[in-house]
């Protein structure tokens, strides 16, 4: 696909040597004050399922069986989480994952940012980190499914609807 070739050639996402946590500098400029948020990006696959469930609940997602969530996480190629550290406590404030055939294709799933942290650019950070890691693995096609109200967000990050007329198809049991 021509689009993806141009997208990745023109992408300004740079590789970095990431350890387990990478500190983000996040400014919250609401209410005429600037507040620094102590947020860390992690690619650690050990996610607390109950914290993830709380995060998903905070945005109104339908509850999913934890047993199946655990299986989905285990079978994910990449997991990115955002953790706020405050004093001795930590809180999961963002999450996304990708599955892949590890050759050509990957799909991004479960992108979620806690409502208190939306509008700070954290969703963009998570998506860019996923794309960066997938591109380092030489994945050439990255897909995702988006609710209608967030399509414009993904378009701003370079995703396109129906590239070259390609349509997603689904099969559901009857």
Swiss-Prot record:
Q: Which residues form the signal peptide?
A: none
Residue span(s) of domain N-acetyltransferase: 42-174
Q: List the disulfide bonds.
A: none
Q: Which Pfam families match?
A: Acetyltransf_1
Q: Write out the GO cellular component annotations.
A: chloroplast
**Annotated keywords:** Acyltransferase, Chloroplast, Plastid, Transferase
EC class, as a word, reads transferase
Query: Would the keyword NADP be found if you checked this record's keyword annotation?
Result: no
The EC number on file is 2.3.1.-
Q: Where in the cell is it found?
A: Plastid, Chloroplast
The text of the family note is: Belongs to the acetyltransferase family. Ycf52 subfamily.
Its name, as the record gives it, is: Uncharacterized N-acetyltransferase ycf52
Organism of provenance = Pyropia yezoensis (Susabi-nori)
Lineage, broadest ranks: Eukaryota, Rhodophyta, Bangiophyceae, Bangiales, Bangiaceae
Which gene underlies this protein? Answer: ycf52
